Amino acid sequence: MCRRESLRTLPWLFWVLLSCPRLLEYSSSSFPFATADIAEKMWAENYETTSPAPVLVAEGEQVTIPCTVMTHSWPMVSIRARFCRSHDGSDELILDAVKGHRLMNGLQYRLPYATWNFSQLHLGQIFSLTFNVSTDTAGMYECVLRNYSHGLIMQRFVILTQLETLSRPDEPCCTPALGRYSLGDQIWSPTPWRLRNHDCGMYRGFQRNYFYIGRADAEDCWKPACPDEEPDRCWTVIQRYRLPGDCYRSQPHPPKFLPVTPAPPADIDTGMSPWATRGIAAFLGFWSIFTVCFLCYLCYLQCCGHWCPTPGRGRRGGEGYRRLPTYDSYPGVKKMKR
């Protein structure tokens, strides 16, 4: 009976062994073991130069977070999001860097209809996140190479739907000048001609003005709600970029006025290029050094001609030469051969 029972259980054991890789794959995709908490965060050397300036877009507009990385040895890649109007921690979409399948999607609650894509290239990888932006989903999105405890942040994309400025009550409302491209240090928008603003009350004696990009279907009727008075989480990044137009942006503390420092003296305009000026200076320096050396050589010749004695000078004639040897008899042939 024992042998028969063991024979009956062999097919079941064989089936379990064959299905183990599938179970492991299913468990890794459905119940991920990776977490969104990164113990050690590092930034790439070209992190600031490759990160574009913050962009101001309209609510409901579709945006894509493109992440492009070169060939690496990290086991996972991710898109890490920190939302401007949320006090919670960061959420993260984690993908396997080898196969490209999803390990964890912490953005599914904030972005339920978002789609992601992963492409493996010969020299690198491209992974992206596409969603419709809103006030709740505006924030900072970072491209990260990571493992279970460490992460290397490669790029940062800042998506904004509203931009807060302050103006004095007795001054007209300022209009910020938005850029047209993502390069540089100026906040930009792909549609700056649709810029609108609305009043959101007072803040520390200043008039709160919120600028937004109007919708194409209802630019004059629709207005977003005024946010809280507290500065958002994106302010630490936004304040690094320029916003021309004589506008005061909100700050967590009153601004500190620095003393005026004297301006450096202006350069004298010679009408010549700097390379021509350097060439003339080098030419004059060379000839000045050559002239000094030549004068020193002439002085040496003149001084030595009068003060330095030469061989044979100042002696009686003939005493300066060696006398020829004298022989009593001419040497024979045998002596010559020696």
UniProtKB/Swiss-Prot annotation:
Signal sequence, renumbered to the chain: 1-25
Effect of residue 16 to T: In strain: Isolate 45J
Keyword annotations of the record: Glycoprotein, Host endoplasmic reticulum, Host membrane, Host-virus interaction, Membrane, Modulation of host NK-cell activity by virus, Signal, Transmembrane, Transmembrane helix, Viral immunoevasion
Membrane topology of this protein: Single-pass type I membrane protein
Consequence the record notes for mutating residue 24 to F: In strain: Isolate 1M, Isolate 10J, Isolate 2J, Isolate 29C, Isolate 27C, Isolate 18M, Isolate 33J, Isolate 14, Isolate 32C, Isolate 39J, Isolate 63J, Isolate 25J and Isolate 9J
Keyword field contains Glycoprotein: yes
Topological domain spans for side Cytoplasmic: 300-338
GO cellular component: host cell endoplasmic reticulum membrane; membrane
Outcome recorded upon mutating residue 334 to R: In strain: Isolate 2J, Isolate 10J, Isolate 45J, Isolate 29C, Isolate 27C, Isolate 18M, Isolate 33J and Isolate 14
A GO BP entry: symbiont-mediated perturbation of host natural killer cell mediated immune response
Subunit structure: Interacts with human PVR. Interacts with human TNFRSF10A and TNFRSF10B. Forms a homodimer that engages two TNFRSF10B monomers.
Function: Evasion of NK cell killing. Blocks surface expression of PVR which is a ligand for NK cell-activating receptors. Binds human PVR in the endoplasmic reticulum and prevents its maturation and transport to the cell surface. Targets also the natural killer cell activating ligand NECTIN2 for proteasome-mediated degradation. Additionally promotes intracellular retention of TNFRSF10A/TRAIL-R1 and TNFRSF10B/TRAIL-R2 and thus down-regulates their cell surface expression.
Protein name: Protein UL141
Organism: Human cytomegalovirus (strain Merlin)
Protein encoded by which gene: UL141
